[in-house]
Amino acid sequence: MENVYYIIIITAIIFEFLLSSLSSLLDIKNITSKIPESFKKAYNQEKYVKSQQYLEARTRFGLFSNLFSISLILFVIHSELFGILDNYVRNQTESYIFQGLLFIGIIYFIQDIISLPFSIYNSFIIEEKFGFNKSTIKLFFIDKIKGYLIFI
């Protein structure tokens, strides 16, 4: 019976990824530099083209980061790392509440560290390229540390 749940979970994860990726690819396919008639009075051509370039860059990056994420999720599920983490957490405390908090906290921290290069690229490459980034590396990491402190 466990195998059935495993297959259902893996199928749902892959299906959601494929559906999301298809949606993103359709978005990219429909990007055009020609401003729609309904926007001509509200937008100038240059700003519209820049917004479409930004949309494409963000969408392509999202496709790549989602592919990385699903690969990692499938690896973790298949390798039974959740079970290993669960055993570790259960040996740290007998309190079910603290076990749950520790389990979620460790997963959050690991996920945040793994996604750090993607966040840096998004903020300091993509956002910078289009003039949206007003942050510095120092401020970026100070915000990360503040986020960890709030989480604790």
Residue map of PLM features:
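Hydrophobic or amphipathic, alpha-helical segments that drive membrane association/targeting
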Residues: M1-I152
